[in-house]
Curated annotation (Swiss-Prot):
This is Energy-coupling factor transporter ATP-binding protein EcfA1. GO terms for molecular function: ATP binding; ATP hydrolysis activity; ATPase-coupled transmembrane transporter activity; cobalt ion transmembrane transporter activity. It comes from Listeria monocytogenes serotype 4b (strain F2365). Disulfide bonds: none annotated. It comes from the Bacteria. Residues 6-240 form the ABC transporter domain. ATP binds at G40, H41, N42, G43, S44, G45, K46, S47. It is a peripheral membrane protein. Forms a stable energy-coupling factor (ECF) transporter complex composed of 2 membrane-embedded substrate-binding proteins (S component), 2 ATP-binding proteins (A component) and 2 transmembrane proteins (T component). NCBIfam families: ECF_ATPase_1 (TIGR04520), PRK13635.1 (NF010156), PRK13648.1 (NF010167).
Amino acid sequence: MAESFVRLEHVFYKYEDTEKYAVKDVSISAQKGEWVALVGHNGSGKSTIAKLLNGLLFPEDGLIKIGHFVLSEKNIWDIRRQVGMVFQNPDNQFVGATVQDDVAFGLENHGVPHDTMVERVESALNEVGMQSYALHEPARLSGGQKQRVAIAGVLALQPDVIILDEATSMLDPRGRAEVMETIRIMREQEDITVISITHDLDEVLFADRVIVMNNGEVHSEGTPQEIFEQADAMREIGLGVPFIIELQEKLVAGGFETGSTVLSEGALLDQLWKLNSNN
């Protein structure tokens, strides 16, 4: 197996003036190009991990490695050049008068030559489907469009890792769908590692692997299917399950045979059709 591109080993962290660890002996990893979802209730430690990965916080103990770099004050900027973050509130992320100015802002801070900057801005906006809005004011965009521009700003920096810190939690269903589809396409085209911090369990279904956090520790880990086959264990720590899992549970409770756990409505319909055809 290839070496993990993102790695935390026995990481501990607690905030000032608190005795309880926000992150306690956490060891997790992600491969290049993998989509990993971190889920958990408020206070589970998932957002603290996001800040640790980007060097916004430093662990009290343990190791954090991104690519070839181990997180330290000496190489913090090497880490940040590899990791881009998209935050919860899109309105708090804009600094430019126009969409293209905003996407260019990070490149200017990195001293990218003008010609290269123009190419990267155009490419990033094309990738998220926002090139036609290049001269628009960010404030006039919808929530989903704003987050797509925020993603373009991160993409223009050409990071190896993108962290989505509750990036869809303030969006309506349409905006959420736009952003998740953008991330899916971007990951496939650029081979970027995606780490999504979320409490939206339907969003988790996009991930290759899920890490469930509880009280600062790793509670469980597996594919979305493996995790949601243990629906009762999720509920025991205050988490729900996606709608598609609830639907299967209700069908079973109503006397219908649904077969193995599936993660999409299409797959469930196919499974029900096959089972019905056999009877």
